[in-house]
Every structure is written in structure tokens, then in C-alpha cells.
């Protein structure tokens, strides 16, 4: 594998992890600024090598998948995200791109708004009556939060006024003002309840309560900023006009919305808002800048995951100084040992910060960090900040060096650092309690074996009570044993047992991904499954044979080979099969031999599928010899268009590319 391929793999793995924590669990571990930096780095590398862009890259999608505790709702019009800029130069470059695409030398009129730090929602009104509300989710599918949204007093249950469209989907942000956030935390401290890290987490936690009565007690509010579905009516032909119309119908709109007729005016707006930020009474992390004219918006169109006519201009991450009191070491799923700085607690952007990740030994060396040092930390709205630098001029005399452990802090096994890698790892494997927990959490996750209802807290208890040591042990659990866990009644226990039984029927690619082999993500697992066809063939493959799989280089091939060479891993796999885990035999990829209409073709999926998940469709297409791409180009052979297919479908039609619908895809797949 080329160095750039290795970088791309690591970046995508890291970004997917943090997307899950942020969008699904509402428990982010890194600041927005660090996530944005990682995304910029990934975009830059993919721009250098567009041939290495994969359909499942974070740059080719909108967000993350929703939880299954709520009913899922498919957005008829996808809820796209915005691209970001971080400085004046980048904004001016964006402004120029817009003018160049419009072939205009005249200034564009911009509509500028606050970028609220809350939770994006969609609210559907039919004949003026609120009938449905959903979270953004992954942009295509969200969670049904209608009952909770109805409790927010700022959101009208019925619109007022005349000429209201028959179906109108309003989009906006639910957020928690600072005063309400402080009140919730005060009450939590008194009652021993959960104290939220910041207003965004509090808003998300409040909005996603299964009991609407809890949501009703939280002082949530809402500003609208856009529209999705529009049927049986008309709206003004400018963005500002639409916001004013929403306000006339009784929907709340920020009073800081401003029209700017030049890029200089936009910059002035940005700096004014930045200056006023501490006095607003609620959290924002930048401003949103949109082309005001709807006709020009339509002319500009969209890229894969964002409109070309809008951008988020984000504020710089906020910084404070504090002291490092100690460094502890945490162990992850693959044995990676991560140093964590324990800080003298300090308020950063309204949140009390007491720890920061230090990533690895190289980062500690780069910083020249010692325990007791005064450091600058940076935070951009989330929980765990980053250490920017050491204030050497104020280094206390009593500092001491940070000593990386030679044995795992959890299980006592030896640690190793492979030459050329930055990460130090525990060699204990599944005898290590920390690795065991994280491995099992990965195994049951939605994109792996998809065991509904088996959350992190259940896994923690199962490992701590020594009920489970390997993934195979999960399938031996009984409802009686599960009932003994905290907050687990007989009905819930039986539901988990049923979910485990259901999960036994999987597909080969998911099973491989669930095993947690280093560097083997979903795309690589699908490629391995499709190429070798059977578990036996994959287990017997040499490193050279493994490298014949598309996008598998020497590093990944070595990890896969070593995994299957380990007797304990083969034993666990045998136990899983003995417990009834099974999958249909995949078709081996060989475009010359496969009798399939998809063999050797580059296929693009767009829109929502109703009969099959997108992941399963991709896996099946790959098994039948297709290459699934994330964007439409002249090299695309076929586009499969589901419901609410958007710009990809339009581009396919423009290029004269063959298009089929979901029903035809299922027929060709033999489903």
C-alpha cells in the first residue's frame, strides 16, 4: 500500500469513529476544530488522488446513522450539510468560485445568519398543522421526534396567516439557551442526576428523550433557517424573503439575519457577530452565508454532500491555559494505548475542561510535555480539547517526565510499538479487559453484526462480571443471565436474546468487519469477502494473494494474514460458526467469469432504498462484480435511483448514463 493510501485509510477510520460519537451518541471526544482539520486533510489527500476516493469515505456522505430507539423517517428531500471555511482568505476564495460559476463580475447578495450549536431538525406542516418532526440523522434517514418537538413552546403546532402551502417542511435548529443550560445542570447537581458538558449535548439529550414529559421540562427553543418539502403553495424567490414569510406564519427566526451586498460586508458581519458572541445568550460556532437569490442557488446547484451556494464560516477554536497534573493511559479496541492529560480544571468556551487526549508518544515528544507543565489547550464546542503547546517560559521547577508504560495498564501484558507506527499497543488481545470491551462493542455495532439493544453499558457489565470473554460467548447468553444485569428486566433481556438470534444470519462482509481486524473497514471487508468468496479461502490466503484484492496493500494484507494465523482467533471463529452464525455464500469476483449485468461496471447509488439497506445493496453489487462509486462521472456505467434521488440522477441524465430504479435493481439481483 502506498503511503498516501495508508494515510487515507487512517483518516477515514478516525473520522467515522468521531462522526458516530458526535451524531449518534451525542458524546463527542474531540473539538469541532480538530474534526474539521481531519476532514480538510482527507479532502486534500483525495484531491491529490481522486482515484482513491471510496464510496464510503466521510467526504462522500452527509453524516451518521440514527439510533434505533426511535422510529426512523426517510427525508423526502435530503438534509445536506454545509462546507466550512475558517479564515477570510478561504471565504474570499469561495466568493470567487461562486462568481466564476455564475459568470458574473457583479457582487452577489448574501444572506448571513448565525450558525447555531444545537440539533438540526425537520418539521413537516400539512395544511398548516404540525404532523411530523425528525432529526437530521445521516441526512437521508432521521429519527421521529414528533412528540418531543410538540413540547417546545417556540414551535407552533399550527401556522397562522394565509396562503400556507399544503405541505411545508421547515428546517431549523433546536438549541438550549445558556440560562436554561445552567438551570438544568444546577438541578442535576442537587438531585444527583446527569450534568451535561455543554448546551448542545443538553439540547440533544433533551430532544431525544423517549418520554416527552422530560423534554417538556427542558427550556428548549428553535430558529428556522430553511425549507425542504414544498407542495401546494409558493414561497418568495429569495432566502431572506422566505425567512420573513416563515416569521409571518408564526415560526421563530433569528433577529441577526442580515443581507450583505459584498464580500467585505460579509466579513464585517462575521467580525461583529464574533465580537457579540459572549452576549448572545446561546452558543454559536460561526456564521452561515447563503446566496440570497433562489434562482442563483438553483443555477449553482450542489456537490455530493453540500450546496455550492452556501458555506459555514466558522470561528477559531477558543483557547485557555492550565496545568497538566497527571497523565493516564487508556487502552482501545485494537490495543492502542492513548495517553490522556489530567488537567487543572479550567473553563473553556463555557465548559469546565479537566482532560485532553495526547494521542501518542510522538505527540508528547513533539510538545516536549512534562507533568506539571503549564499548557495552552484549545476547545471548539465539544468535550475533550487538544493541547496546543507548552508554555516553556512558565515551566515550574517541579515538573517530571512522562514515562510511557512498558506493560499494559489494564492487563499487565507487554506493550509493543511497530516500527513506522506512532501507536503503542497492548499485546494481550482478548485477555485484556479493556480490549475485550471495545472489541465486543465493535462486534455488536450496527454496521457489524447489528445486535439491536446491546449497548455499551451492557457490554461493560458482561465483561466486568466475566459472563463474556469472546464474541462467541454473546450467543450463549440466556435471558435469565441478562436479567441479573443493572436496569435489565425480563422483557428487555428476552429482546436482547432475540436480537442475538436474529444477528446470527448475516453476510460474509459484515462478519469480517465485525471481527475487528486492524485496518479492515467496511469497504475492505466487502472487497475481501467478494474476492475470496469463502472464509476457508480467505484464511488460507498468503500475504501476496491478499494484495491481489483491490485497495489492499502490504500493511492491510499483513494484518489480515496475522489475524488468521493466530490460533486463538481461529478458535473464536470456529465457536461463532458452531453457535450458528452463518451467511449466504458470496459470489467470487471475476468480471470475466461472472454472469451478471453488474459485472465489471461502475455503479452509483442515489436516493433512498426502501427494500434493502444501502450497505447491503453495495455489498451485493460488489459480490456480483460491480465497482460501487460515490459520484457520477463519464466513467459511470449505471445509476440506481431510489426515492428522492437528487443531483446524481440529474447528472446521470445529462450525461446519458443508464438509470434503473430500486425495483429493477432487486430484479437483477434476484431478490
Curated annotation (Swiss-Prot):
Keywords: DNA damage, DNA repair, DNA replication, Ligase, Magnesium, Manganese, Metal-binding, NAD, Zinc. Residues 593-671 form the BRCT domain. It catalyses: NAD(+) + (deoxyribonucleotide)n-3'-hydroxyl + 5'-phospho-(deoxyribonucleotide)m = (deoxyribonucleotide)n+m + AMP + beta-nicotinamide D-nucleotide. GO terms for biological process: DNA repair; DNA replication. Zn(2+) binds at residues 408, 411, 426, 432. Its cofactor is Mg(2+); Mn(2+). The active site is at residue 115. It comes from the Bacteria. Belongs to the NAD-dependent DNA ligase family. LigA subfamily. This is DNA ligase. The lineage of its organism: Bacteria, Pseudomonadati, Pseudomonadota, Gammaproteobacteria, Enterobacterales. The gene is ligA.
